[in-house]
Amino acid sequence: MPNIKSQKKRVLTNEKSRASNKAIKSEIRTAIKKALAAKKDEATDATDLINHAVSLVDKGVKKGILKPNKAAREKSRLMQA
C-alpha cells in the first residue's frame, strides 16, 4: 500500500480506468464474436455487425485500449471470407 498521498490517488484512478478499459474490451470482444457468428451463418445483418465491430476496434485504438497491430489483425480477420 502506498504511503505517498499522490500515489494513493493514483491507485484510485488506476482502478477506475482499469474497470472502464475492461468494460470496453469486453464490448469489443462481444461485438467481434457476434460478427463472426453472423458471418459464419451468412446472416443478412452480418455486414452491419462487422461494421459495428470494426468501429469499436478503431475506437479502442483511439483510446489506447488496444494496440494498433492487434486492431489491424482483428479487422483483417473480420473482413476475410
Curated annotation (Swiss-Prot):
<keyword id="KW-0689">Ribosomal protein</keyword>
<keyword id="KW-0694">RNA-binding</keyword>
<feature type="compositionally biased region" description="Basic residues">
    <location>
        <begin position="1"/>
        <end position="11"/>
    </location>
</feature>
<comment type="similarity">
    <text>Belongs to the bacterial ribosomal protein bS20 family.</text>
</comment>
<dbReference type="GO" id="GO:0070181">
    <property type="term" value="F:small ribosomal subunit rRNA binding"/>
</dbReference>
<protein>
    <recommendedName>
        <fullName>Small ribosomal subunit protein bS20</fullName>
    </recommendedName>
</protein>
<dbReference type="Pfam" id="PF01649">
    <property type="entry name" value="Ribosomal_S20p"/>
</dbReference>
<keyword id="KW-0699">rRNA-binding</keyword>
<dbReference type="GO" id="GO:0003735">
    <property type="term" value="F:structural constituent of ribosome"/>
</dbReference>
<dbReference type="InterPro" id="IPR002583">
    <property type="entry name" value="Ribosomal_bS20"/>
</dbReference>
<feature type="region of interest" description="Disordered">
    <location>
        <begin position="1"/>
        <end position="20"/>
    </location>
</feature>
<dbReference type="InterPro" id="IPR036510">
    <property type="entry name" value="Ribosomal_bS20_sf"/>
</dbReference>
<dbReference type="GO" id="GO:0006412">
    <property type="term" value="P:translation"/>
</dbReference>
<keyword id="KW-0687">Ribonucleoprotein</keyword>
<dbReference type="GO" id="GO:0015935">
    <property type="term" value="C:small ribosomal subunit"/>
</dbReference>
<comment type="function">
    <text>Binds directly to 16S ribosomal RNA.</text>
</comment>
